[in-house]
């Protein structure tokens, strides 16, 4: 609107652009709420045996977005090198009821090296899928080679997984926790474990390390405090009489 009135002003139809003096309200950042260690332990215990246990597990220990983990295909999983190629996502096409693959949020594929526990979870999922496929034979539907599917091989609906997650969180009395907070939990724990910001940025698929720093400023502030405490202890040790 501001730009449109500016163009009209140049033609002489109006003398002043009244919107030029209007200050837009600042949009506050959404506060991130990663799971605390005790909450994460309770969550992992609660999801044991859950239909989507391995989906949640992979997200919380890789930081993948929901669409990225639901769009992961077996050709992008390298068990020998312990790597995952994240090059697409899967979800509902905007304005339709159709589910399909689409490009990543930043349109930048990334290769991440996953922890042993994550690869073990994926191997477990592979074996489970093979068992389902053997039982259904010609009825198996996974033509897209998806890692996470229903027992018939169909894709998982984002909303179905989300609603199941919210039920878990309600049982844990953590109703305010959002699905995306699993990704935040991974990021904060990575930083607290000593991963450098560039590695965390690349694993998360952020455009820049500066963006990652901005989003997780509270975590890095905590790390600075811990660093100062370690230095204080070091000074104490080297200056002892």
Which stretches of residues belong to each language-model region?
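N-terminal DNA-binding recognition helix of tyrosine site-specific recombinases/integrases
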Residues: 1-20, 65
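Short, polar N-cap/turn motifs at the start of nucleic acid-interacting alpha helices
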Residues: 76-83, 175-176, 195-217, 225
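DNA/chromatin major-groove-contacting recognition/catalytic segments
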Residues: 38, 42-48, 95-101, 193, ...
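C-terminal secondary-structure termini that scaffold catalytic or DNA-interacting sites
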Residues: 81, 92-111, 116-118, 123-124, ...
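Active-site/catalytic core of tyrosine-dependent DNA strand-transfer enzymes
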Residues: 89, 115-175
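Catalytic-site neighborhood detector that most strongly recognizes the C-terminal catalytic loop/helix
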Residues: 26-30, 34, 89-92, 119, ...
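DNA breakage-rejoining catalytic core of tyrosine-based enzymes
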Residues: 11-17, 26-45, 81, 87, ...
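C-terminal catalytic core of tyrosine-transesterase DNA break-rejoin enzymes
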Residues: 10, 57, 61-68, 159-160, ...
